Amino acid sequence: MGLLNSKNPQSKQAHILLLGLDSAGKSTLLYRLKFAETLATIPTIGFNVEMVQLQSSLTLTVWDVGGQEKMRTVWDCYCENAQGLMYVVDCSEGKKRLEDSRKEFKHILKNEHIKNTPVVILANKQDLPGALSAEDITRMFKVKKLCSNRNWYVQPCCAVTGEGLDDGFRKLTEFLKSYRRTRETLAIFKQK
């Protein structure tokens, strides 16, 4: 993976929340990014936390929170320190599951702790027949409307092959840099 790099002690850190329904591919995606290979995963009960060093000298602490229905009720608890949200959608699923995913996405965006944080939706499983495109997900999830107050991007990807992951994380790091500059500027004005 092109974004991975050796540890740099002077790198900046960012806390990223990785959410999506169960079986959307969150853990597969995270371990593909971290180890540049596909690892066998099991359903996440609770959460996984991994630190991923990017070439941009930014270290991401990625919180991969389980997507089972019972776990979704505690997603809000993980938002407090999040500086970015990556939401994974299984684009090959049926209408009911996609609608459930859309509802959960809409709900999590209402959390006060992440009201302006950047969002990247990873439109996963593009390798499967009939998978919805990034444009389809943008429309179905009403991303333009729901994310009008923040930077957002919808990236088609395949967690198994790694296709599109570099681009999605690169976009997120661009957003994070911009988000930090904005927050630092606001902090300066608040001090005056």
From Swiss-Prot:
Biological source species: Mus musculus
Transmembrane segment boundaries: none
Official protein name in the record: ADP-ribosylation factor-like protein 14
Domain of life: Eukaryota
InterPro entries for this protein: P-loop_NTPase, Small_GTP-bd, Small_GTPase_ARF, Small_GTPase_ARF/SAR
Quaternary structure (record): Interacts with ARL14EP.
Signal peptide region: none
Subcellular location field: Cytoplasmic vesicle
